[in-house]
Swiss-Prot record:
Main location: mitochondrion
Designated name of the protein: Holocytochrome c-type synthase
Pfam families found in the cross-reference section: Cyto_heme_lyase (PF01265)
Keyword Metal-binding set for record: yes
Organism annotation: Gallus gallus
GO cellular component entries: mitochondrial inner membrane; mitochondrion
GO molecular function: holocytochrome-c synthase activity; metal ion binding
Residue span of region Disordered: 1-39
Family classification: Belongs to the cytochrome c-type heme lyase family.
Biological role stated in the UniProt entry: Lyase that catalyzes the covalent linking of the heme group to the cytochrome C apoprotein to produce the mature functional cytochrome.
Catalytic reactions of this protein: holo-[cytochrome c] = apo-[cytochrome c] + heme b
Keywords: Heme, Iron, Lyase, Membrane, Metal-binding, Mitochondrion, Mitochondrion inner membrane, Repeat
Amino acid sequence: MGLSASSPAATAQSAAEPSKQHQVASPPSECPMHQEKMRGCPMHMKASDRRAENTDDVPAHQERAYEYVACPVKSGASQVNDDIDPSNMMPPPNQLPSPDQPFPLSTVREESSIPRAHSDKKWVYPSEQMFWNAMLRKGWRWKDDDITSEDMTNIIKIHNQNNEQAWKEILKWEALHAMECPCGPSLMRFGGKAKEYSPRARIRSWMGYELPFDRHDWIVDRCGKEVRYVIDYYDGGAVDKNYQFTILDVRPAFDSLSAVWDRMKVAWWRWTS
């Protein structure tokens, strides 16, 4: 789940990008369309001093992310100055075009459906420009590939859909704890571990299956309890109309007896169903 920082203000051209992308983003909390008071779960609504204690869990880029979420009646965004990003082990990218960038990219960001821990907001996905800058920082060079602005639009859609799919799979596991956490889980932080193959992935490879092309670990807040989920990403072939091509293997890590018991139960249900 690549989420990134933002820096300069989005231009009127950037604000018009959603129609070009055929992508409707949820209005930000400050948008006039969002006047209804949000209702939060009492178990997630922390006191102000508790939130202050958990500021290190919140990525710097998420604090101002809603300034780049498209609002139907508001365009532009104020300047953002983020210095650190403590939650995803990456320096914060920005919304500035790279020096030799061949075409303009949208700086509009889409709100996800994933609740952010210790907050009444959702996680916000990176813009096309942020994703481009992140790939450059990791060593990618656009001149080596035949890539267009439309390709970047599709890459963002695939990226966002993969994360939505991953969260839905996590919610299936969390349904086992609905009595324990009736308000539902929220995402605290995450990290990519593409070359740190899980034991399950290695065992599958020994059996002749391909290794995953990526791995993420997501840390979920289950009403005050931290739960780590391992997500292995496998190539599923052609991209469908919903921008899904990845097969996800999502399960709680063996960090506790509760997680072990959950996986034993689910394995038994799958075996006997």
